């Protein structure tokens, strides 16, 4: 709060089936708690694991959010399939701006720090060799566990240990590598608030 960082609301619940029955309530509660703590409303929101349910956009609008950044225009088996959605920002009915996370137009692969770590630099050098497939607005998804190994790492289920253990100390290096690629293609870097305001002014 004192540092005046660009932060926005995120769901507390990460079990998507549990979230499904309480998403609207949780969006409003997140806004209320955020506003009370920061003294201003949250402009943006992120749903758990990139999953949106019918009615969520209307609930976001009703809770006063200007943008959502939940959608991966990609597929994650068992959770979502948003390959039919654009890889560039769009406006939902109801006036909420969607700032989708980066996915490649030709393959719909999600370009996240977690996926950079899972697949490795050599794989992504091949995937990213054609900038024409990159979204013009490149929103990078990341988590704290991409950069810092949790103290309870060894207590995680085996599947999580295998996934998170791949290149677990390389999060910062791989993000820096991606940023340099983007710089080389002329991308400029802004926070989510600035991006939201700039894009909404164009609509």
Regions found by a protein language model. Name each.
Residues 23-34:
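An active-site-proximal "capping" alpha-helix that borders the catalytic cofactor pocket
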Residues 40-141:
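Active-site-adjacent pocket scaffolds in enzyme catalytic domains
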Residues 1-10, 31, 61, 92, ...:
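Acidic (Asp/Glu)-rich catalytic clusters
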Residues 14-20:
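A short acidic, helix-capping loop that chelates divalent metal ions and anchors anionic groups
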Residues 6, 66, 188:
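Residue-level detector of anion-binding/catalytic polar loops
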Residues 8-14, 143:
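Histidine-centered divalent metal-coordination motifs
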Residues 1, 23, 56-61, 202:
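Distinct, well-ordered alpha-helical segments
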Residues 121-203:
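C-terminal domain-boundary segment and adjacent tail
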């Amino acid at each position: 709060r004192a540092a005046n960082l660009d932060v926005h609301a995120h769901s507390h619940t990460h079990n998507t089936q549990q979230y499904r029955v309480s998403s609207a309530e949780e969006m409003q509660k997140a806004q209320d708690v955020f506003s009370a703590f920061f003294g201003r409303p949250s402009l943006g929101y992120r749903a758990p694991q990139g999953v949106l349910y019918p009615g969520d956009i209307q609930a976001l609008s009703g809770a006063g959010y200007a943008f959502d950044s939940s959608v991966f225009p990609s597929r994650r088996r068992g959770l979502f399939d948003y390959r039919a959605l654009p890889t560039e920002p769009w406006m939902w009915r109801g006036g909420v701006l969607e700032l989708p996370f980066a996915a490649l137009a030709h393959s719909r692969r999600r370009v996240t720090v977690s996926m950079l770590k899972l697949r490795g630099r050599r794989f992504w050098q091949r995937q990213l060799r054609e900038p024409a497939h990159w979204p013009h607005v490149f929103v990078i998804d990341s988590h704290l566990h991409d950069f810092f190994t949790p103290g309870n790492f060894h207590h995680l289920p085996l599947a999580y240990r295998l996934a998170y253990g791949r290149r677990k100390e390389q999060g910062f290096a791989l993000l820096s590598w991606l940023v340099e690629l983007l710089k080389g293609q002329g991308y400029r870097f802004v926070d989510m608030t600035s991006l939201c305001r700039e894009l909404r002014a164009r609509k």
